[in-house]
Amino acid sequence: MDVAAQFGDNLIRCRKLANLSQDELSVMASVHRTEISQLERGLRIARIDTLAKLYGSLEVDPGDLLVGIVWTPGDMRIGRFKERAPDG
């Protein structure tokens, strides 16, 4: 599972444990509901300020939104950031 999809699953889990709808979380976190939907579906990666708003509103540890995410440099692509080809 890629980083965006894993984060999305974690966000859904935390939101449901808090008994919040996307709309309710949107208001509490000051993050547009469409962005929350895209994050949950793994269509985008959360910026650090968005991450802080989400874990603060959900009253969870930041690590709860990052469970299962392992980053190995060069092993995946995220959004518009792409691996660079080796020189030579």
Task: Show the residue positions of the predicted features.
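Ser/Thr-centric signal marking residues that sit
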Residues: 21, 34, 50
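Recognition helix of helix-turn-helix/homeodomain-like DNA-binding domains
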Residues: 30-45
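DNA major-groove recognition helix of helix-turn-helix/homeodomain DNA-binding modules
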Residues: 30, 49-64
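Short basic helix-loop element that most often maps to the first helix and adjoining turn
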Residues: 9-28, 53, 79-81, 86-87
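Short, charged recognition helix plus adjacent turn
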Residues: 56, 66-88
